[in-house]
Regions:
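ATP-dependent carboxylate/acyl-activation modules
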Residues: 1-63, 100-137
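C-terminal hydrophobic structural anchor segments
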Residues: 60-101
Length: 137
């Protein structure tokens, strides 16, 4: 976890994915509040802890962007961690989640059943996170 100056929280499951997403956030007029990269094999607990780290790390986050592209990591487990965190710690900011990879459909189902949006396209996800942070609906 590295705190930054902006207002868009960012969680990614790899350094490359995170760096690309940081660039896209800036290219679209936003500023990231952090760089939280989970790296390596993850689990629902690791995802939960990443959410906890971001929300306890810096005040003033206006949207949270979670970008997960899993080969080894299972998207259903990542979704379980996100949903569990939000059930235990409701947040009032928009959440933007992009899931792609192993067990993707199962992960999307878990998110949708919890009433949480899931994005198929990284650029659309980033654009919405930037728009939400700027106060857009």
């Amino acid at each position: 976890y590295v705190p930054l100056e902006g207002d868009i929280g960012l969680i990614s499951d790899g350094a490359g994915t995170g760096m690309l997403t940081l660039d896209l956030i800036r290219d679209m007029g936003g500023e990231a509040a952090d760089f939280c990269e989970m790296g390596g094999l993850t689990s629902p607990e690791v995802m939960y802890d990443a959410m906890k780290e971001v929300f306890s790390g810096k005040p003033g986050i206006k949207s949270l962007l979670v970008v997960l592209i899993g080969g080894f990591n299972r998207m259903d487990e990542m979704a379980e961690g996100i949903v569990r965190y939000l059930r235990e710690h409701p947040v009032s900011i928009p959440l933007v989640v992009r899931l792609c990879g192993t067990m993707e459909e199962e992960g999307k189902t878990i998110m949708k059943e919890a009433g949480l949006p899931v994005y198929d396209d990284l650029r659309t996800a980033v654009a919405d996170a930037v728009r939400f942070a700027a106060g857009g609906e």
